[in-house]
Amino acid sequence: MKVVATNRKAYHDYDIYDKYEAGIELKGSEVKALRQGRVNLKDSYVRIKDGEVWWLQGHISNLETTYSAFKHDEKRPRKLLLHKNEIAKLAGYTSEKGYTLVPLRIYFNNRNRAKLEIAVAKGRKLHDKRRVMKEKELKKEAASAMKRYGF
């Protein structure tokens, strides 16, 4: 499995509850750009509309070598491929207040198919972000102290 890009900001801004693997409906030039790592997940999000799951604002850059007739819109909505029962589960989660769908990472699986890992998440407040950062820092200090004293 070759990870192309991760959305590190999602782990900071959201509490992650459930993860799903979704296929992506792409054009040829988009696949080639993905293989070169020309993708940005930072400001993208996932929505369910009319029983279909869509990845919105995902930025896949055009290649300089692509002929102008084959160039794609860099931020076009891309359909995600999931089973009906998974879509129903996700719709149930997102109907609850505060829950949303966020893309976590994009990668090529062992069969060389582009996949997007999406998660059901709930936004964190500022004080929650600070608390989580403090806990991580304490954990890191404890681990280094244990290592230093040979435990």
From Swiss-Prot:
InterPro entries, sorted: SmpB, SsrA-bd_prot, SsrA-bd_prot_CS
Superkingdom in the source lineage: Bacteria
Annotated localization: Cytoplasm
A family per Pfam: SmpB
Keyword flag DNA repair: no
GO molecular function, one term: RNA binding
PROSITE patterns given in the database record: SSRP
Gene Ontology annotations of biological process type: trans-translation
Gene Ontology cellular component terms for the protein in this record: cytosol
Keywords per UniProt: Cytoplasm, RNA-binding
Homology family: Belongs to the SmpB family.
UniProt function note: Required for rescue of stalled ribosomes mediated by trans-translation. Binds to transfer-messenger RNA (tmRNA), required for stable association of tmRNA with ribosomes. tmRNA and SmpB together mimic tRNA shape, replacing the anticodon stem-loop with SmpB. tmRNA is encoded by the ssrA gene; the 2 termini fold to resemble tRNA(Ala) and it encodes a 'tag peptide', a short internal open reading frame. During trans-translation Ala-aminoacylated tmRNA acts like a tRNA, entering the A-site of stalled ribosomes, displacing the stalled mRNA.
Official protein name in the record: SsrA-binding protein
Gene: smpB
